[in-house]
């Protein structure tokens, strides 16, 4: 592997977009990074994918449209795809710190964090932990928390036991996150897309998936999300089976000045119907960019 791993800045400056390589984040590990260069001087969007997905599966169909106006960067989160190897427990805070470390490695002073589902929670944590680096937020199909009802709390209680069973049973460790991921995807009409999605999901282990779902179930930003002071857009998937619309809207209402961009689609529209998702995502990013520019000193 040593011959394939390069410094992040070297990797992303070598070729025209879209470019993907394994790259090293100093002191943290090796991950896969994608970049579309965008126009000279364009604002940077840092794309953060959802649980069990990879950057390619979550964002692959929007790289090119976004890059017409923005510099676009995406990372495989730790434990997912070619992401940094994770330990016995997956932490959203570690993922947020990885994204900030990538920005540091690339000399990116500030960026717009664009997070999808679990990635939206990581984007929220970027504000909490690395606010000086954020120029905006785009939060898609996500919430302040997903663990509220008694049934959801009961389900979450089983996750530590399941994670421990996999950790101590060698026969279970090679199992992939395909089941979890296909549940999130829902119906996929195109057979080629379904095959591609399954192949991507198999690159994440079941143990990581369970640990990540547990981290998502424990996340809450209720006490501090109202402190967000950067331009924010919330993309609401109004037919979502995974994150209730009511929770997505509560997130939007909790953030001062957040714009809402509705899309009549299920949770994984980013993958199952990118032609529907892309215009709404672009609208959300343009909204944040317009407000960011207005806030700049004259």
Model region roles, listed by residue range:
Residues 258-298:
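Catalytic active-site module of serine/aspartate enzymes centered on a nucleophile-bearing elbow/loop
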